[in-house]
Amino acid sequence: MHGAPEFLTKVKQQYLQQVDLYRFQWVSKPTDWPILFNDYAQVFLSEIVTPSAYTRAFLKSYFRFLDSIDSGHNERNEALLYTYIESLSSTYIPPVQYSLGEYDILIRESRHVLLREGTTGARTWEAGMALAEYIYQHPVQSGMRVLELGAGTGLVSILCAKMGSIVLATDGDTKVCDGVRENARLNNCDINVKKLLWGVDPPEFSDIVFASDVTYDCDLRCLATTLTQIITINPNCKIILSASLRRQETFFNFLKLIQNLYARQLEVWDSPKILYYDSPPIVFYEVSK
């Protein structure tokens, strides 16, 4: 529906991103509540929802709010009710959609899985979302050679590919690489995906490198070796790192390991978040020769 109120557009974005209902932002201001439950809003929602386990929880929450404020004068939209009934038995898990301006990126992931088969790459982490926002606000150039380390679900790589860059997405886990390939196909993106073990496999020539949440205790020295190799191959390469400061000591230990390179913290922009996530403080660093 065209001309929808801004808060309904945000509801749609959160629904497609499958934001947890306990932190779902239904309205932007108190005066939006009556609009959220009128006939227009119900038709708007009926056009975006599809039967799934997430939709079941989403509509259950919506109907609960509706029952709490409605005195029974408004009829429930039949299409919404039908979708809810279908969702009761649905086991379908749709891809998550991350919307960054004109770029809609579909990602198949396990949003509530922290670790699967020894890897954290089964879901998109907050630092990865923040890095995607950073790239959207500081676009890569068409034709630029982009390397992503620890690609995870591939959100950052796919965004860069949609911007016209030549992308190599890498990860140290074979199954994670398979997941990136699947997500690239889902978005009709031509992305080269390769398994890369830090400190072991030689990296390829790149104009710019992106990595999010890659500073772990056991991998710090190997990561530092790979970053040094990248700069050696192309001294003009820039490396952009994002990290959630869950353990600041670990990140600062990493910075000590790359003292042979130039690392500077990037200033946090004042723009509001585009995607929906909660996170510890996230820092950005640019590493260069």
From Swiss-Prot:
Top EC class of this enzyme: transferase
InterPro entries tied to this protein: Methyltransf_16, SAM-dependent_MTases_sf
One GO molecular-function entry: protein-lysine N-methyltransferase activity
Main location (coarse class): cytoplasm
Short name of one Pfam family: Methyltransf_16
EC numbers on record: 2.1.1.-
Residues holding S-adenosyl-L-methionine: 125, 150-152, 171, 198, 212
Function description: S-adenosyl-L-methionine-dependent protein-lysine N-methyltransferase that methylates elongation factor 2.
Family, similarity comment: Belongs to the class I-like SAM-binding methyltransferase superfamily. EEF2KMT family.
Name of protein: Protein-lysine N-methyltransferase efm3
